[in-house]
UniProtKB/Swiss-Prot annotation:
Belongs to the class I-like SAM-binding methyltransferase superfamily. rRNA adenine N(6)-methyltransferase family. RsmA subfamily. It holds the Pfam family RrnaAD. It comes from Shewanella baltica (strain OS185). HAMAP family: 16SrRNA_methyltr_A. It is found in: Cytoplasm. One of its GO terms (cellular component) is cytosol. Its EC number is 2.1.1.182. GO terms for molecular function: 16S rRNA (adenine(1518)-N(6)/adenine(1519)-N(6))-dimethyltransferase activity; RNA binding. It catalyses: adenosine(1518)/adenosine(1519) in 16S rRNA + 4 S-adenosyl-L-methionine = N(6)-dimethyladenosine(1518)/N(6)-dimethyladenosine(1519) in 16S rRNA + 4 S-adenosyl-L-homocysteine + 4 H(+). This is Ribosomal RNA small subunit methyltransferase A. Specifically dimethylates two adjacent adenosines (A1518 and A1519) in the loop of a conserved hairpin near the 3'-end of 16S rRNA in the 30S particle. May play a critical role in biogenesis of 30S subunits. Keywords: Cytoplasm, Methyltransferase, RNA-binding, rRNA processing, S-adenosyl-L-methionine, Transferase. It is an enzyme of class 2 (transferase). S-adenosyl-L-methionine binds at residues 18, 20, 45, 66, 91, 112.
Amino acid sequence: MSNKVHLGHTARKRFGQNFLTDGNVIDRIVGAIAPDNHHVMVEIGPGLGALTEPVAEAVDNLTVVELDRDLVERLHHHPVLKDKLTIHQGDALQFDFGQLSVPGKKMKVFGNLPYNISTPLMFHLFEFAEQIETMHFMLQKEVVLRLSASPGCKAYGRLTVMAQYFCQVVPVLEVPPHSFTPAPKVDSAVVRLLPYAVKPFPCKDVTVLRHLCTTAFNMRRKTLRNNLKHMLSDDEFEQLGIDSSQRPEQISVQQYVAMANMVCDKKA
């Protein structure tokens, strides 16, 4: 049998499917998620149910978002899960997670994410950060390093700044390729994202922050002065106490927010 077949389902490359099969890893992830009935539990990409089954055992209801119609059909007919699941068939990148919110209940979101959409999905989920208590995701290890990087690191970039603006980022565990079927060609890791109830560095307009970060990191090897010359002057960098001869990966989240707020003030 092909090593891409698990429980009778053939993994689809276009959906980035790698199914988690290591029981010890599954137990550790479920322990980190800490499922309960005090939150709206949401799984992205339940696949063949490796995380779905143990989480559903611990709660009255679990909402899942799955793109693959074949897997949705399996879940609808699952002898144990079908009565506990609320299933949304569709693309998580387009899904309105806000519709799942319940008064007085924040969401706990988790999933073994397809690596080919993990970064854009992070940016999409940040839009709903105020309605989310925790997020736990299996990601390519490289992405977890980017999420948790510090200024000055090679991994530090636009994703780092935006993730750490919205959330506290905590790497949980590393997961080797043999924990999956089929085995991916890269190492994986689980990360915990804890959205801030009160942001440490509030931004006046997140759209401006997002645009500023994109512009700054488009040419990583060039200086802030070069990359942001159409947004901030040398005098304004000086007012902020930021050395404009530095490269974008040398600038802290707090400094990016300060730059974005100055741009907002100029527009006002």
